[in-house]
Amino acid sequence: MAGRYKGLVYSRKRGRYGKTYQALGVKSQRELEQLVNQPGRPVSNRRPALQVAEYLWTTNKTGMTFSPGGSTFLITNFPQGANENCRHTNRTITYKMAVKTWVALDGSMFSRVSKFPIYFWLVYDKNPGESNPSPSAIFDSLYQDQPGTWTVTRNVCHRFVVKKTWSCMLESNGVDPNAKQGSSYYGPGPCYQWRHVTKFFKRLGVSTEWKNSSTGDVADIKEGALYLVCAPGGGATVRVGGRFRMYFKSVGNQ
């Protein structure tokens, strides 16, 4: 074919943002600005915010005392009511948990020279009873002073499930940290007689069905309780203080 281009067809080169315009379905910057400036559609199916319940150990700042063998506490304690920390329906779902605590040796342990592991568990109870179960009712705690060996007892494994576990290590050097030392002191240096423990757990997915009652104790739960279990190792006595935040929703019928 005669002519300057001999039948070849040439297309104009795309600009700097050509691919971006094509992905957005526009042809120019002007069309993009019009698209951005369009009023947004209202979102009518936005999910409600999570409710928050906070527990303090304790308000007098002394903390809770744990001895060898440990103790169990209900952590899904949601009484019936209209406040944010209350259940509004007969069923709740606990999604998240924030832990900001301190763990310290009891004063009776300062004279010892040793290390003490402290263990924590979040335990789901499918069929709770009238009171909190003891750790020995959940775990095979043959070695009471070595909680790291504990496991859910075989004949109750259909009822209890360990959701989360964590631990920390405390130390004692034989010196009372509350006592002032003089210039002639050349004893052992400081050690971890207390620690901060911070945790945040997601995707717990604990569904709790409640009885028709106003309180939030374990006896008010039909199905699905969540406990916090703490047990010190090495025969230690410890104190645990701080705050726990539970993030949950009220679902089901009122």
Swiss-Prot record:
GO cellular component: host cell; host cell nucleus; T=1 icosahedral viral capsid
GO biological process: symbiont entry into host cell; viral penetration into host nucleus
Domain of life: Viruses
Protein's cellular compartments: Virion; Host nucleus
InterPro entries: Gemcoat_MSV, GV_A/BR1_coat, Viral_coat
Pfam families, A to Z: Gemini_coat
Family to which the UniProt record says this protein belongs: Belongs to the geminiviridae capsid protein family.
Purpose of the protein: Encapsidates the viral genome into characteristic twinned ('geminate') particles. Binds the genomic viral ssDNA and shuttles it into and out of the cell nucleus. Plays a role in protection of the genome from degradation, virus acquisition and transmission by insect vectors, infectivity, and systemic movement. The CP of monopartite geminiviruses is absolutely essential for virus movement.
Protein name per UniProt: Capsid protein
